[in-house]
Amino acid sequence: MQDRRSSYDYEDLLACGRGELFGAGNAQLPLPPMLMFDRITEINDSGGEHGKGLIRAELDVNPDLWFFACHFKGDPVMPGCLGLDAMWQLVGFFLGWSGGLGPGRALGLGELKFSGQVQPNIKKVVYNIDVKRVMRSKLWLGIADGTMAADGEIFYRAKDLKVGLFRQDAAVQPAV
């Protein structure tokens, strides 16, 4: 099953997490609390700097988000790894949206730079993913650059985010 809308709300993202959006055994988002965005506001396969696709997603920030209570007591900040994971989640979603089969796994990245922290006073985080390449074979591999902005200021820059979809019948499986 292929779902090619240009935007997705929170209920759609939860359906993806349950394996209902792209079909059982295919690309899924994690369910809360690890789902790191509330909506995908734009997704297409022709936009972005490289003309290969772009994804925009948003997270509404409030002081009650689960990670602020434990990271760190008295100095709450969103863990940087969660923002990075959100970018990997979006690349995997793009692969499923593009018709790729099999469950997804983050495979690495080339470079990551942090220049700010998401604290409870932030109102909105916006993720922008610029797809650079999609390789389609038994393994679907997506390579993209991404940014995470908080209230309009870019805090994270990632280069060469890599995510693969591994068909169940493929000979190559990710190391666990």
From Swiss-Prot:
GO terms for molecular function: (3R)-hydroxyacyl-[acyl-carrier-protein] dehydratase activity; trans-2-decenoyl-acyl-carrier-protein isomerase activity. It is found in: Cytoplasm. The keyword Ubl conjugation does not apply. Its EC number is 4.2.1.59, 5.3.3.14. Pathway: Lipid metabolism; fatty acid biosynthesis. It holds the Pfam family FabA. The active site is at residue 71. GO terms for cellular component: cytoplasm. Its main location: cytoplasm. The keyword Membrane does not apply. It catalyses: a (3R)-hydroxyacyl-[ACP] = a (2E)-enoyl-[ACP] + H2O; (3R)-hydroxydecanoyl-[ACP] = (2E)-decenoyl-[ACP] + H2O; (2E)-decenoyl-[ACP] = (3Z)-decenoyl-[ACP]. Keywords: Cytoplasm, Fatty acid biosynthesis, Fatty acid metabolism, Isomerase, Lipid biosynthesis, Lipid metabolism, Lyase. GO terms for biological process: unsaturated fatty acid biosynthetic process. Homodimer. Belongs to the thioester dehydratase family. FabA subfamily. Necessary for the introduction of cis unsaturation into fatty acids. Catalyzes the dehydration of (3R)-3-hydroxydecanoyl-ACP to E-(2)-decenoyl-ACP and then its isomerization to Z-(3)-decenoyl-ACP. Can catalyze the dehydratase reaction for beta-hydroxyacyl-ACPs with saturated chain lengths up to 16:0, being most active on intermediate chain length. This is 3-hydroxydecanoyl-[acyl-carrier-protein] dehydratase. The lineage of its organism: Bacteria, Pseudomonadati, Pseudomonadota, Alphaproteobacteria, Hyphomicrobiales.
